[in-house]
A protein has these predicted regions:
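Short helix-initiation/N-cap motifs at beta->coil->alpha
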Residues: 84-92, 216-225
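Ligand-binding pocket segment of bilobal, Venus flytrap-like solute-binding proteins
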Residues: 217-246
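Proline-aspartate-enriched helix->loop->beta-strand connector
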Residues: 99-103, 234
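A short, structured surface patch at a secondary-structure boundary
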Residues: 48-97
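Extracytoplasmic substrate-binding proteins
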Residues: 113-187, 271, 279-306
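Structured C-terminal subdomain patch of bacterial secreted/periplasmic proteins
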Residues: 38, 236-306
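Basic- and aromatic-lined ligand-binding clefts that recognize polyanionic substrates
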Residues: 39-54, 152-212
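N-terminal secretory signal peptides
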Residues: 1-13, 20-27, 31-34
């Protein structure tokens, strides 16, 4: 597609996508041509995930946060795709060389370089990197794949409805139970909140949250010491570690042996579930969210916790 053709979107056009926009069949976002762009660069993990879900292979992606250079679950689709650097610092030179028809970025990561990105190609600017439904809807519209996006959202809603009923049956008389999502790192533990990627999925499934989680702002709480553990006390824990760090593993081993840990409800009831860090914290897209549902379904089925 040539830049001087009438159906080519303005290279200076930035789509600042409004919150909660409903994508309907036939909708084309302002400034984006009706013909699906052939070459798309995705500058955050959730956008790369979403492109694959929509059946689009980007011409450029950013490095993954772990399992480098690309998350294992996306490698079959993206193994041959060129990389343009880090999500926090993509290479403008590499992006230019790829000659994209569209760039998908986020205000959270890329607001400062947006004027430069829009000189390269039309720019779809999402607000956040982890709001997977919004990313799916907006990319579906920008890529002229609204029907695929709506189908994926419909399948998601059906899965959530079914799993919610299974969880209600599994915890009959106790539902909704409280939940905490714990990220064990090298030098501290982080508890994810309802506003996080994982938190939004758990809330949609009907899980309840601890008072501290409901009152806190942001996406996570940092627990600087084991003495803070009572703050996250809940009926069920989902817990993961970032990467294969020996230091993080040591932190985990010390955690589960600590007297305060053993006094918490989830450990006492055998409701501590080890889950995948990529799916729960680093993926940010509809495919990663579905991987979360796969793991949560083990809880609903009563598969043995760890």
């Amino acid at each position: 597609v040539r830049s001087d053709e009438p159906d080519r979107p303005s290279r200076r056009k930035v789509l600042r996508l409004s919150l909660g926009l409903l994508v309907l069949p036939g909708l084309t976002l302002p400034g984006i041509a009706r013909a699906a762009p052939l070459r798309v660069v995705t500058l955050f993990q959730g956008a790369s995930d979403t492109a694959v879900a929509l059946g689009v292979t980007p011409c450029g992606v950013v490095d993954s946060w772990s399992e480098k250079p690309m998350y294992r679950y996306l490698r079959p689709a993206l193994a041959a795709v060129p990389h343009v650097g880090l999500e926090t610092q993509p290479s403008l030179e590499d992006i230019v060389l790829l000659k994209p028809d569209l760039i998908v970025a986020s205000r959270f990561r890329h607001q400062r370089i947006a004027p430069l990105l829009e000189q390269i190609a039309p720019l779809v600017m999402l607000e956040e990197v982890f709001e997977f439904k919004r990313t799916l809807a907006m990319m579906g519209a920008a890529l002229n794949r609204q029907q695929q996006a709506m189908a994926l959202l419909g399948q998601w809603q059906q899965r959530v409805t079914t799993l919610r009923e299974q969880l209600k049956a599994r915890f009959a008389g106790r539902w909704p139970i409280t939940v905490s999502v714990l990220d064990v790192r090298e030098d501290h533990i982080r508890s994810y909140l309802p506003a996080s990627f994982a938190g939004s999925v758990l809330s949609e499934l009907g899980f309840d949250w601890t008072p501290a989680a409901r009152e806190a702002q942001g996406v996570s709480l940092k627990l600087s010491s084991k003495e803070s553990l009572p703050v996250v006390d809940a009926d069920l824990f989902f817990i993961f570690q970032r990467g294969d760090s020996k230091a993080a593993q040591n932190t985990y081993e010390k955690l589960v042996q600590h007297p305060f840990w053993k006094q918490l409800r989830a450990p006492q009831d055998g409701q501590v579930w080890r889950v995948d860090a990529v799916a729960w914290s680093l993926s940010g897209g509809i495919l990663g969210a579905n991987l979360m549902l796969d793991e949560i379904s083990k809880v609903a089925l009563g598969t043995r916790s760890s």
